[in-house]
Regions:
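Zinc-dependent deaminase catalytic domain
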Residues: 1-139
């Protein structure tokens, strides 16, 4: 029997990513990233858009692409233990930019699930071109 009140793993992980995003000091774009094992048994890393450790978290600008902050994806990838042999997937509150998408491809993450689309889908296209599974959480 299926418990219809039991939340899916996608829902749980996306809620965690949304909560992590609230750590960002950016007033417009609070972005969260969460890396988990594909079998949903381990949280491996997390990140949000913010500055380098010890530096001011005040964005240089509120204009898109000009904040000067590290993107959530990069912060999560920097903290990831690459020795873990399990396959990995990443949950994002915003689809990746092209730069972050390339970093994700190089990290050997196999699937990316995003909540909202970035201002362009160039990053999503890069992930697809590299044969990663990529999908909108809302689809």
């Amino acid at each position: 029997m299926v418990d219809i009140n039991r939340p899916s793993w996608d829902k749980i992980w996306m809620q965690v990513a949304e909560t992590i995003a609230q750590r960002s000091h950016h007033s417009t774009f609070k972005v969260g990233a969460l890396i988990v094992t594909s079998d949903n048994t381990q949280v491996l890393s997390l990140g949000y858009n913010g500055n380098a450790a010890g530096m001011s978290n005040v964005p240089q600008s509120e204009e898109p692409g000009c904040s000067g902050l590290l993107h959530a994806e990069i912060n999560a990838l920097l903290k990831l233990d690459y020795n873990n042999p399990k396959t990995k997937k990443m949950y994002l509150t915003l689809s990746p930019c092209e730069y972050c998408a390339k970093a994700i491809v190089n990290s050997k993450i196999e699937e990316v699930i995003y909540l909202k689309p970035y201002r362009d889908l160039g990053g999503v296209n890069i992930l697809k071109e590299a044969n990663l599974k990529v999908r909108s959480y809302l689809d």
